[in-house]
Design a protein with these regions (language model features):
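Hydrophobic ligand-binding cavity/cleft-lining segments
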Residues: 1-50, 156-158
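Glycine-rich portal/gate segments that line the openings of hydrophobic small-molecule binding cavities
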Residues: 42-90, 106, 140-158
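Solvent-exposed residues in well-ordered beta-strands and their adjoining turns
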Residues: 12-15, 58-62, 99-101, 112-116
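Hydrophobic/aromatic beta-strand elements that line small-molecule binding cavities or substrate pockets
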Residues: 9-11, 44, 69-75, 93-100, ...
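Amphipathic alpha-helical protein-protein interaction surfaces
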Residues: 17, 27-30, 78, 103, ...
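Beta-strand/loop substructures that line and gate deep hydrophobic ligand-binding cavities in soluble
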Residues: 85-140, 157
Length: 158
């Protein structure tokens, strides 16, 4: 059985311009600074999203296992969003879409991974709800982290 998942998560960053949110979300090498509960290590190409930019990632949720995966940007349109493919413990892809909303910036991740980590793949038929909660936990850490990071670096208007 394939361990296919589909998640759509939306973050709101109060007072932030989407250009600033895009720049933060787009620089994966910086994720451990503001999303460190989830992104333990990220190595790869520096700079903004662009086709061909790659990153190697070690991540985790609240469950006691880690995931090793790589991402490659396949399309980028600053500040509207970017699309990526992934391989490793995750296969598939995702797309970040950003938009201005009243009072700040909104970032939506449409994430469609197939999990290839053997034990997760084997246990998905029974533990899918728990793995979904693990994803929700990870995304909540990201939402909290980016809001605080943007506040600290002055991403809110004066």
């Amino acid at each position: 059985m394939r361990a296919e998942y589909q998640f759509v998560d939306r973050w709101f960053v109060p007072g932030a311009r989407i250009e600033d949110v895009y720049d933060v979300i787009g620089e994966q090498l910086e994720y451990p600074k503001w999303w460190g509960d989830v992104f333990l290590a990220v190595t790869g190409d520096e700079g903004p999203p662009r086709p061909g930019r790659r990153a190697s990632i070690l991540s985790r949720g609240f469950l006691p296992y880690k995931l090793r995966w790589s991402s490659e940007i396949v399309e980028a349109q600053r500040p509207r969003g970017f699309r990526m493919t992934v391989s490793g413990d995750f296969v598939g892809g995702g797309e970040w879409t950003l938009e201005e909303v009243d009072g700040g910036g909104s970032a939506t991740l449409d994430w469609r991974p197939v999990v290839e980590k053997p034990f997760v793949k084997q246990l998905t038929p029974v533990l899918r709800p728990l793995f979904r909660v693990n994803h929700v936990w990870a995304m909540r850490r990201g939402q909290e982290g980016i809001v605080e990071y943007m506040r600290r670096r002055g991403g809110e208007p004066q």
